[in-house]
Structure formats: C-alpha cells, structure tokens
C-alpha cells in the first residue's frame, strides 16, 4: 500500500527541489540566450541580433561562444558574421569578423549536432575576453554574407562564461 503525503508536504518537497535546482545553476555563466528567426524569413542582414548584459567582475576573463542553428534550406557551407561589443555609452569596444563552417564543402555533410533537418553548432569566438569596466554592455551579431536575407537560419545563441583560473 502506497502512503500519500498531504498536499502541504508535497508542496514543501516540490519547493525544496526547485530551490536545489536554482542553487545548482552554473554561476560561471554570465549570459546564455538565443534569438530565433521567423521561419519563413531567416536572418535579415540589416537586422543585427542584440544581447544585453551587466558585467560586475572586470578582473575575470570570459569565453564567448556562438550557437548556430540552421536547417536544410541554408544555401551555403559557411557563415560569416560580425560580433560587436558595445559599452553602456554606445562605444564599440571590440568588433571582428567570424566564420564558421556549417557543412563539409565537399560532401555537404552538416557539422555539429542534428535532429531531423535542424543542425546546431557551438563554437568559440573569443577565448579571453575582458571587460574594461563594470556596467551594462550589448553584444551584437550582424550577418555578413553577401545576401540580404539568409534563408534556413533557425536561431543564433550566445553563451558567455567566466573562465576558471584562466581556463574553460
């Protein structure tokens, strides 16, 4: 015979589990966000993706990863984009050009992990990023391919992790 807990005890157990999950979250993650594109549109070149964050620890280094998700409608084997880091006063403190290979150029086989016709690839773009001062920042990703609208793009994500003892 199974003995059931009264409702108030069940709520207590559920609350405790929720608290434990929250306490076990990764404190080294400063930002972990994803922006999805409209399915029928893709990534429009003149519409950069923006991520907002607040930096308090300026002594630590951070690793910045981009997570690209695309489907079989993506027309190229690679992706060029421009990541920018903008401080709270609107000044660009870092800008670059990044490329990732999404499909093998010879075989056409997708790189990264896939499920159905959607593939995901995570890659490092900055290994030792430092912020000059505490405050609000914006990270912007601009599509840099030679087409106005990039079909087949599902989403772009950004993961910013504090490096432990100088390493991730």
Walk through the language-model features, giving the residues of each.
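Short tyrosine-centred short linear motifs in exposed loops/low-complexity segments
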Residues: 59-62, 123-143
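C-terminal motif of bacterial Sec signal peptides marking the signal peptidase cleavage site
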Residues: 20-23
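A beta-strand/beta-hairpin structural motif
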Residues: 47-48, 98-103, 110-125
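Internal, hydrophobic beta-strand segments that form the core of beta-sheet-rich folds
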Residues: 132-148, 152-162
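Bacterial N-terminal signal peptides that target proteins for export
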Residues: 2-14
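Short coil-to-beta strand junction motifs in C2/discoidin
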Residues: 75-81, 152-155
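Short amphipathic, basic-aromatic surface patches that mediate peripheral association
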Residues: 66-74, 145
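Bacterial signal peptide processing site
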Residues: 25-28
